[in-house]
Amino acid sequence: MKAAEIREKFLKFFESKGHTIVRSSSLVPGNDPTLMFTNSGMVQFKDVFLGTDPRPYSRATTAQRSVRAGGKHNDLENVGYTARHHTFFEMLGNFSFGDYFKHDAIKFAWELLTTVYQLPKDKLWVTVYQEDDEAYDIWAKEVGVPTERIIRIGDNKGARYASDNFWTMGDTGPCGPCTEIFYDHGPDVWGGPPGSPEEDGDRYIEIWNLVFMQFNRDAQGNMTRLPKQSVDTGMGLERLAAVLQHVHSNYEIDLFQNLIKAAARVTEISDLTNNSLKVIADHIRACSFLIVDGVIPGNEGRGYVLRRIVRRAIRHGYKLGRKGAFFHKLVADLVAEMGTAYPELKEAEQRVTDVLRQEEERFFETIEHGMSILEAALADVEAKGGKVLDGELAFKLHDTYGFPLDLTADVCRERGMTVDEPAFDDAMARQREQARAAGKFKATQGLEYSGAKTTFHGYEEIAFDDAKVVALYVDGSAVNEVKAGQDAVVVLDHTPFYAESGGQVGDQGVLANAATRFAVADTLKVQADVIGHHGTLEQGTLKVGDVLRAEIDAQRRARTQRNHSATHLMHKALREVLGAHVQQKGSLVDADKTRFDFAHNAPMTDDEIRRVEQIVNDEILANAPGIVRVMPYDEAVKGGAMALFGEKYGDEVRVLDLGFSRELCGGTHVHRTGDIGLFKIVVEGGVAAGIRRVEAITGDNAVRYVQELDARVNEAAAALKAQPSELTQRIAQVQEQVKSLEKELGALKSKLASSQGDELAQQAVEIGGVYVLAATLDGADAKTLRETVDKLKDKLKSAAIVLAAVEGGKVSLIAGVTPDASKKVKAGELVNFVAQQVGGKGGGRPDMAQAGGTEPANLPGALAGVKGWVEERL
């Protein structure tokens, strides 16, 4: 039975038992910031179990894509070396939310395994929690499992309820016993049943875990029964497939065998048992699905984990002899295996391929040099009888050549060595400290404040008349008074000033009364609800308790608002034009422009840029109102509001409807889209692999930009004696004229070189049957020098030639050697002999090489030495 059929039978079985088939959630958890990746089937149902996310069903079943390669759950280092470790796996599960409990859960599992999958009953063993008599009796008395194959497992992890058969969500909260089902591979495989000293062997393999959420544990450790008891089960598809396909390693199942064969094809390896092929086959699954879910290779967080996995796969390909990009070629094979079950993979095939190819090409630029350094260091350690690689060197490989620590550790392990990880960590810490010392940080963090929060009025007002000073800070310390000329941070009880957040810069403006004037240069958060006004006291003395008029720079705010609102419209337009994979990765909105970074793996075409501009300007012309609502986060997301990747949101969120855009946003915005005026993209480029950046301007800035562009067009048209409407045609005519003249000039240069070549041939000196010539060719470019050398070689038959030209204070050199002489006189060595004397270097083939230099004054002497240099080698 193939893996695809196993998956389908599982889902269909539970659907027949009244379960709703729920599609796999993203590998990036949307409801649990503590998790790096979705690592089990229950993650998407966590809030359902907690009662905060009501669903229209009480029974569910899933095939959940899962990754264990970061944070607490990290299987990366074992992948490829064991039979059952993977970075990516599929977790089959069925769930009951206050519906059925132990009886049905156990009976469903037994029926599926023994009737649908037809596993022999005498091959199945089960474990239960020591005190779970109910589960024990169901297995023994109702299902009929012999008691010798039912094993009670107690608190075997050193604490009360710390057991392989007791599940907890955390230190407090829902928890309960679990029962696990094991498959016995038979006496030919070493190992003992669970709970025995030999349980780590491969004979008895856990295939299904049924968790019974029965209790709630409080902070004192007290257990109370949950009013609604639930079930969470998980069974690894790959493990089950190995059992049903009668193999002992997950890598022997059909799905993996097809990927391993594909990996062998692209790496040109015939030995299908090579562990590196297993690594590559595993990693293409994790990498592809992470990219499908919006993760891009990067230097931190999820992006760095993805980069580590990609580079580990590349390193194993390199180990097999691949010196160029190969990994991305496996995406099509993965789509063939899993694209039907997961159509999102098929839809994103080209994007996944492009992202992986770019990451490969980037790493292949450094891997060879890095590997040579690592291999030399390991050889040195071995020669000295050591077993530990210096952590400082491992850090250099990480910092300079992009080698993740686990990649270096992987190579070391293959040689029976380890890495000095504490030394690596020390080096990393030093670098971070240096970076902190070198950077300039705004003085908002670390200010000690324990007063009331600031009330923000900036959504409605640009000024507030009776703002009271509640705290003052100078150089990071709280003070009671600030004097004229001092820089300070002012905290008010009420303010219209927006504090930098969500990509929007903080407001500027003035705090003043009859005797005092404080110029606000920036506004930043001291705490989540406390706003700090950063600036300089220009007049008077400012004390805690003073009352001021707080007024923002209204013109600057208006420009910033236009840019911020345009960013929302642009984000939506980018998704319409480029695809739903577009995700915001960063932004900066100020009075001058909006800068927007987003996930996309190719430069935008001119047509795509024009389409985005058109869509945004159409929304501006529609003059739609901006509608703001405050609502619970879950309600907002269900209503279609876009939650931005990496942003933190509270229980209550601010939702902005602006034209066709709906986003969660706490920033300030225009009242109607027409207030934006005009939208123009001025910059599009790449900032990292898979990340593009767009800069755009609005309003009067956009009008001014278009006017300046129009003026330049008119100037160019006048210079070419054409009307602006004819400019493109006139430029094409001029380009044709230039091309024709360049061709004519090239012909004249060749003709001149030919005539000079005849003269130069007469200057050649014969040494040992080889004609040697070193001369300057006035007015020649590199192409002319090469052509002249070729003609001289043909004319002289046996020769070693160096020709030079000087232009703009720079020397161009070409050396040519005929085949009969190139065994003793190499053109690359000859040209370098001259180049080093004129402040340069070069290289090339034994018969033709070129170089440059910056010291033309030394050229005559350098050319004069050629005859002697050649004579020594003949």
Curated annotation (Swiss-Prot):
Enzyme Commission designation: 6.1.1.7
GO cellular component terms, semicolon-separated: cytosol
SUPFAM superfamilies: Class II aaRS and biotin synthetases (SSF55681), Putative anticodon-binding domain of alanyl-tRNA synthetase (AlaRS) (SSF101353), ThrRS/AlaRS common domain (SSF55186), Translation proteins (SSF50447)
Note accompanying the cofactor annotation: Binds 1 zinc ion per subunit.
Record's subcellular location: Cytoplasm
Role summary: Catalyzes the attachment of alanine to tRNA(Ala) in a two-step reaction: alanine is first activated by ATP to form Ala-AMP and then transferred to the acceptor end of tRNA(Ala). Also edits incorrectly charged Ser-tRNA(Ala) and Gly-tRNA(Ala) via its editing domain.
Protein name: Alanine--tRNA ligase
Gene (UniProt): alaS
